[in-house]
């Protein structure tokens, strides 16, 4: 029987299935952080249950921590409570924790792959919507709620209904200067933010294969932003090269056996997908969101669309509301839009390749006078260490940016990195919802190079026209 990659992953993890009932899946890897885990551990204590498989769960601190201090005692309010609770709960249960005193600590979706915890063929869950990131390795990875976090801790299983399958093929090669972030934003622009609803998406095509693992993680990270349950990219030699010798990756004969199995994790040639979407890579230009969801996105060289010209009444109403909030008018050229802040970071774009791309733009330049602040936040302590080894931190600081410690930072208004009211930000994060980066903050999603350029020129520019150093 021919199967898609998703079907192979799903079927191979079924623990129990009966007619008329939702299948129960075995979970290979459970990642936790300080925000969605405290109530789950409380639930275990109330029910007098233990963590079933301690060695399958790993924790880190990322969402609410400060990127300015590494001392828990200097945290305030809810952030301090959450961090201390995670520390207490992991010590009590024996779960491995990468806390803020270690260089292995980082954003959960950066730390997991770095440590080799993310492997092809796995089922991976986390109490975070961007768990789809790990699908870049050919793993079935998706976000879960706090009650499900408790269930996985207690049983190492999860009830999960089958999703539909979608194939998104990006044909050919992208032009110079076009990144994984541009590819996924262009995809969401075509499908809309609801285009993948009810589906698990497999990304394929030459443009996807050409991406590094870091680029592939960027693509899968934002699968949720088109409404998909998860995103997948079949593993290949690029995947294996990235994983080899990672701390938790198989070693010796186990590695050889694992690679032999991983090579089978491909959709069969005649596999049927419920939905197929194709894009031509050559048509993708640098992308900038203009509204309040990632599907409201255009090329930097285009003008903001007129809601009155939209045939769909729901889309029209959404666009009108978005433009009112974002403070822009239909017909505006994006290259005329000035920014107040720049954020380079998040689980979408805080890896070493992202920082190198930003540094290439910022080297030898200075922050524009109208830009109040540029935050550069590495995704983990190991990324920070590598960036400093390469001297990237000095480039950022010389350009007028702030070089921070690892954390989710300004991706979400849950810590002390926030936009001021009605400030406009060029951000490498994954969501531009109303208030996402702070009360009444205005967010435009872009690639790291585009964000860095906005910081240097004070407005959006076409990165293809910027000399790199």
Swiss-Prot record:
Give the protein's recorded name.
3-isopropylmalate dehydratase large subunit
- Keyword presence, Nuclease: no
Annotated GO molecular function terms are:
3-isopropylmalate dehydratase activity; 4 iron, 4 sulfur cluster binding; metal ion binding
Which reactions fall under this protein's catalytic activity? (2R,3S)-3-isopropylmalate = (2S)-2-isopropylmalate
Q: Which InterPro entries match?
A: 3-IsopropMal_deHydase_lsu, Acnase/IPM_dHydase_lsu_aba_1/3, Acoase/IPM_deHydtase_lsu_aba, Aconitase_4Fe-4S_BS, Aconitase_4Fe-4S_dom, IPM_dehydratase_rel_enz, IPMI_cat
> According to the record, how does the cofactor bind?
Binds 1 [4Fe-4S] cluster per subunit.
Q: How does it assemble?
A: Heterodimer of LeuC and LeuD.
Keywords on record: 4Fe-4S, Amino-acid biosynthesis, Branched-chain amino acid biosynthesis, Iron, Iron-sulfur, Leucine biosynthesis, Lyase, Metal-binding
Gene Ontology biological process terms, A to Z? L-leucine biosynthetic process
Q: What class of enzyme is it?
A: lyase
Q: In which pathway does it act?
A: Amino-acid biosynthesis; L-leucine biosynthesis; L-leucine from 3-methyl-2-oxobutanoate: step 2/4
Residues involved in [4Fe-4S] cluster binding: 347, 408, 411
Q: What domain of life does the UniProt record list for this protein's source?
A: Bacteria
- What are its E.C. numbers? 4.2.1.33
Tell me which family the UniProt entry assigns to this protein: Belongs to the aconitase/IPM isomerase family. LeuC type 1 subfamily.
Cofactor needs? [4Fe-4S] cluster
Tell me what gene encodes this: leuC
Entry function: Catalyzes the isomerization between 2-isopropylmalate and 3-isopropylmalate, via the formation of 2-isopropylmaleate.
């Amino acid at each position: 029987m021919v199967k898609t990659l998703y079907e192979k992953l799903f079927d191979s993890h079924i623990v129990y299935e009966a007619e008329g009932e939702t299948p129960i899946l075995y979970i290979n890897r459970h990642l936790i952080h300080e925000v969605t885990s405290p109530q789950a551990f409380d639930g275990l204590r109330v029910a007098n249950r233990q963590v079933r498989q301690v060695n399958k769960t790993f924790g880190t601190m990322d969402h609410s921590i400060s990127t300015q201090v590494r001392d828990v005692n200097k945290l305030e309010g809810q952030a301090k409570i959450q961090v201390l609770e995670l520390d207490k709960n992991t010590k009590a249960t024996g779960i491995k924790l990468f806390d803020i005193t270690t260089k292995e600590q980082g954003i959960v979706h950066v730390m997991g792959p770095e440590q080799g915890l993310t492997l092809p063929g796995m089922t991976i869950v986390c109490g975070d919507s961007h768990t789809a990131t790990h699908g870049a390795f050919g793993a079935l990875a998706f976000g879960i709620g706090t009650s499900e976090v408790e269930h996985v801790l207690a049983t190492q299983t999860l009830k999960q209904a089958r999703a539909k399958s979608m194939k998104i093929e990006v044909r050919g090669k992208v032009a110079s200067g076009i990144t994984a972030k541009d590819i996924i934003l262009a995809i969401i622009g075509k499908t809309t933010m609801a285009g993948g609803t009810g589906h698990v998406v497999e990304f394929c095509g030459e443009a996807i294969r050409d991406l590094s693992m870091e680029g592939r993680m960027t693509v899968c990270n934002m699968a949720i932003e088109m409404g998909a349950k998860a995103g997948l990219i079949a593993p290949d030699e690029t995947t294996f090269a990235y994983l080899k010798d990672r701390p938790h990756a198989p070693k010796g004969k186990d590695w050889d056996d694992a690679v032999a199995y991983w090579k089978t994790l491909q959709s069969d040639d005649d596999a049927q997908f419920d939905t197929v979407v194709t894009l031509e890579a050559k048509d993708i230009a640098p992308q900038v969101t203009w509204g309040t969801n990632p599907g409201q996105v255009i090329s930097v060289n285009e003008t903001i669309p007129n809601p009155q010209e939209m045939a769909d009444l729901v889309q029209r109403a959404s666009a009108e509301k978005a433009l009112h909030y974002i403070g822009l008018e239909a017909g505006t050229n994006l290259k005329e839009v000035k920014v107040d802040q720049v954020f380079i970071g998040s689980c979408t774009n805080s890896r070493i390749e992202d920082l190198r791309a930003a540094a290439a733009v910022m080297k030898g330049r200075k922050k524009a006078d109208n830009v109040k602040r540029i935050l550069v936040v590495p995704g983990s302590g190991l990324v920070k260490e590598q960036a400093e080894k390469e001297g990237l931190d000095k480039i950022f600081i010389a350009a007028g940016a702030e070089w921070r410690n690892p954390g989710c930072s300004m991706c979400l208004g849950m810590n002390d990195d926030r936009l001021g009211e009605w400030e406009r930000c060029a951000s490498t994060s994954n969501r531009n919802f109303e208030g996402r980066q702070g009360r009444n903050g205005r967010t435009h999603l872009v690639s790291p190079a585009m964000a860095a350029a906005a910081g240097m020129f004070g407005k959006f520019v076409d990165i293809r026209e910027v000399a790199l150093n």
